């Protein structure tokens, strides 16, 4: 991995004037000028047959890294609806609306209803079929809502709808995942349930045909690698990991503060509603000022409704976006861990080969060491092997030559495995670099959208409060002008004061 040591670090920020900062999704429709390349890790990248493929090395620019193309694919998730109400099979479905100019779709605008399990199936399948992608995660199950029976409540369903919307938007902004055939079927197919059953059957059949030891082998490799350090860490990914940890920590602090802000907005809503109730209790006691009291109480209630709208957006949308981004960062760090394991696999194979080469060279340079008749001058393994061969009547020289021959075959096999592992590791490195750039672009778009929406809600709230109280002042001044006695009393009171 020495050739990567001089690579520039991956930036976590993008030039705001570059194309990758645009919220418009990217991608191109499949035509004769484009071809898909699939690597050994199952990830597809688009490259033009008329141009050199984009590189992810030190000369790569932001567009190369992010894989930007043309095309529009915009999705929205909203309108939670309780299905099969009154039965034990009740569930919530969400309206998924899509606008696109992809030729692979039958219409440019269409809508379907999907439930959470449909989104979960989409996520799990993409996660399995695109291991080199940091597939955006789904929102958590929120098991407490299932225990308390509030999983059909408007707050829970609204919060989940926003999270599912962000999940789909991240997919549509990803240059590879937005072209996944399963995503197109999910967005458009009226027979989605039948497709899920068929896809699940094929997947289970494929797993049963495979080796039964594959899962155990993968687990063993992961377990062993967990206690192994990389010999030559790549500075690019060290910096990405450090910045991911720092961003995760900062978002956690912001999340706690925003949650406190949402609670205070909820308290203000309750206090303003209580204030309006108390003013209305004054009406029977002060019939002469009934109209001003009623108008004032109504204005206070209107302000309380504004606080509720602001609190709902802060709690259900913006706070959820912070938690969803934290989960997305976990996916990126998991991809970095997978990349590290591939490098560990490569380095372990190199170590095995070097040990085999050293043993072969030792046998060739010092044949007598193989016989090891003296336990004081030989290794325990050589001495025991020599004694066992003596007991069996084996020719030591012939055994040594056979051992050298087997080592030569083993070295040849390990050399091929090393080259294959090196190629896989380097290809995965390049994919991870692109994936980090994709994450950067998606993160920038999402932050801009969520902060912009939060700012608009605050503008609406304060503008509404200004309009409410300006209207109250105007009505009070109008009543004062229309009531000479009240006007005279007010002026007299002012002089007396």
Swiss-Prot record:
GO process annotations (BP): endocytic recycling; mitophagy; piecemeal microautophagy of the nucleus; protein transport; reticulophagy
Region annotated Disordered sits at 1-59
Q: Kindly indicate whether the keyword RNA-binding belongs to this entry.
A: no
Q: Which GO terms describe its molecular function?
A: phosphatidylinositol binding
Domain PX per the UniProt entry, residue ranges: 72-194
| Example of a GO cellular component annotation carried by this entry | endosome membrane
Q: Identify the main location.
A: cytoplasm
- Presence of keyword Disulfide bond: no
InterPro entries the UniProt entry points to = AH/BAR_dom_sf, PX_dom, PX_dom_sf, Vps5_C
**What family does the database annotate?**
Belongs to the sorting nexin family.
Notes on the domains: The PX domain binds phosphatidylinositol 3-phosphate which is necessary for peripheral membrane localization to the perivacuolar punctate structures.
Protein name in the entry: Sorting nexin-4
Organism of provenance: Aspergillus fumigatus (strain ATCC MYA-4609 / CBS 101355 / FGSC A1100 / Af293) (Neosartorya fumigata)
